[in-house]
Amino acid sequence: MIIYPAIDLKDGACVRLLRGEMSQATVFNTEPADQARLFESQGFEWLHLVDLNGAFEGKPVNGKAVESILGAVTVPVQLGGGIRDLKTIALWLEKGVSRVILGTVALREPELVREARREFPGKVAVGIDAREGYVAVAGWAETSTIKALDLALKFEDSGVAAIIYTDINRDGAMGGVNVEATSDLAFHLTTPVIASGAVSSIDDLIALKKEEDTGIQGVICGRALYDGRIDPKTALDLLSSVSVSGTPVTGKAG
């Protein structure tokens, strides 16, 4: 299982939001490239970037910060936020992003996701952010009437690299990741799932690791890494292990 340290960008700085509220932002580093270098030096093999301003405005906003990160590290980077057309996808991939995350357009223009996947195989993930089980878009400002699983199932045969699932009500609140909802989603899909939202302790990582065989391929971790609740080496050792304390992980039926 891969752990993805999160670098959320707002006004050029590395921040964490509380439940997706832009007014509830805590600045952790004013130099995102330095934060990226730190994560790489700690042994992380991927980085997860989000252009928060871009998610709200529907276009890239923190481009300079993203480019500074791409120039500072050698590990692959996945990026979401404000990516809503093929031109923007191509631009970021040309600049060195390894995988783009499509969120709002996955709900509003699912065919664009399929077209992007065909044009950029292995480079496109779908971000599904849910509030009480229903998909939220436009930087979480709007909640739809579509359930997360129903949207995910639309892309089962499209060949997207992963589904990134976030429980908005828990995100940034340190209340513990929603393991049940994440594993249930993964169980019903063949597409790998990456868990996100409120990972607050090693216990959360253990709980997710035990459900790895349902299809949970990775986990995004933010605030808990920044404030020291999760030790990088401990987390990396845990998630690279075959099982947790000898406890077999559960498997998919059939």
Curated annotation (Swiss-Prot):
Q: Name one GO molecular function term.
A: 1-(5-phosphoribosyl)-5-[(5-phosphoribosylamino)methylideneamino]imidazole-4-carboxamide isomerase activity
Q: For this protein, what is the EC number?
A: 5.3.1.16
Known InterPro entries for this protein? Aldolase_TIM, His_biosynth, HisA_bact_arch, Isoase_HisA-like, Isoase_HisA-like_bact, RibuloseP-bd_barrel
Q: Where in the cell is it found?
A: Cytoplasm
Q: What's an example GO cellular component term for this entry?
A: cytoplasm
Cysteine disulfide partners in this protein: none
- Please list the residues that make up the active site: D8 (proton acceptor), D129 (proton donor)
Could you list this entry's UniProt keywords, alphabetically sorted: Amino-acid biosynthesis, Cytoplasm, Histidine biosynthesis, Isomerase
Q: Which reaction does it catalyse?
A: 1-(5-phospho-beta-D-ribosyl)-5-[(5-phospho-beta-D-ribosylamino)methylideneamino]imidazole-4-carboxamide = 5-[(5-phospho-1-deoxy-D-ribulos-1-ylimino)methylamino]-1-(5-phospho-beta-D-ribosyl)imidazole-4-carboxamide
- Pathway the protein takes part in: Amino-acid biosynthesis; L-histidine biosynthesis; L-histidine from 5-phospho-alpha-D-ribose 1-diphosphate: step 4/9
Instruction: Identify its protein family.
Output: Belongs to the HisA/HisF family.
Q: Which PANTHER family match?
A: 1-(5-PHOSPHORIBOSYL)-5-[(5-PHOSPHORIBOSYLAMINO)METHYLIDENEAMINO] IMIDAZOLE-4-CARBOXAMIDE ISOMERASE (PTHR43090:SF2)
Check the record and name the NCBIfam families matching this protein: 1-(5-phosphoribosyl)-5-[(5-phosphoribosylamino)methylideneamino]imidazole-4-carboxamide isomerase (TIGR00007)
Protein name in the entry: 1-(5-phosphoribosyl)-5-[(5-phosphoribosylamino)methylideneamino] imidazole-4-carboxamide isomerase
Instruction: Tell me what organism the protein belongs to.
Output: Azospirillum brasilense
Organism classification? Bacteria, Pseudomonadati, Pseudomonadota, Alphaproteobacteria, Rhodospirillales
